[in-house]
């Protein structure tokens, strides 16, 4: 078996590449496989895909690419295959506002309606006019958050509580990117806890987990993703849901399971061995408590290192049923990882600056 992380123009900073390579090495070791570095060309991959090859793409891949790579089942990928590229993005979480004409081919209007009970209030839009109209529709009821679809790690988001702030936020949006990928307009929450709820299947084994995300400040002063702590059990999301956890957490798990089932029903060609959902719980600007799924991740992500550490711990002890693992991203410091941790990156990234990324088993 060989591991091929596929190439992408996104997530291509030095620390991203190093993290993907370390992740692939550890997955290869877990499956007693050969690791092939991410510098392999896509042409070589298209010629060399075999049933025993496991692909680790940077993002979700579409059906056409999956067929060229020989991917037919989720056991051949750590990540996901989607019928249309937009299905792998946060844009599917909400209905399109109005009769927005640039809605992409393959868009199902019933999806947003079906997901509505399980997500925050919001809209998706594909033109500046639609973004503004949707935002004005919501501003009378709540503060809003604009989210660029292609942005990751908490970047590309703007909060507006007034028309003036909306205009300032919209001035930062890229119109060609809106036409291509869309923008999410969503109610903004304060006092937010962001949960990670997910399941991953690798080499015939399955884990599921709930966890919390932490935020940090990057070297440019922006608030970004800083890591996750995952509480992992063997088995499916349904097994996780049966544990009788605290009410808010249970709601989050149930909503993630519903989101997963609805998208899988409407897009039956979806394949995903990694199904991770961000769930936010917080308070609206009018004091209402809200909880809902923000987005899906069917690709290698920030919490992937913690997931693989959990697989490793459970493989070492077949009688063990649960484990807690943590991923951490620290900006401004090199060699900040504690003893006993698994280092994914430690150095000075030419773009992101000095940083350390590591994973630890906690208990």
Describe the predicted segments one by one.
Residues 222-289, 316, 320, 324-359:
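A long amphipathic alpha-helix within ATP-dependent nucleotide-binding catalytic cores
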Residues 93-183, 201-205, 217, 229-261:
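Active-site nucleotide/adenylate-binding loops and adjacent lid/helix of ATP-dependent enzymes
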Residues 1-39, 107-110:
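Short, charged N-terminal beta->alpha structural module
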Residues 304-317:
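A short alpha/beta connector and helix-capping loop motif
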Residues 35-139:
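Conserved N-proximal alpha/beta basic substrate-recognition cap immediately N-terminal to
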Residues 150-151, 188-192, 269-274:
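A short catalytic or substrate-binding loop motif that flags glycine-/basic-rich loops and adjacent residues
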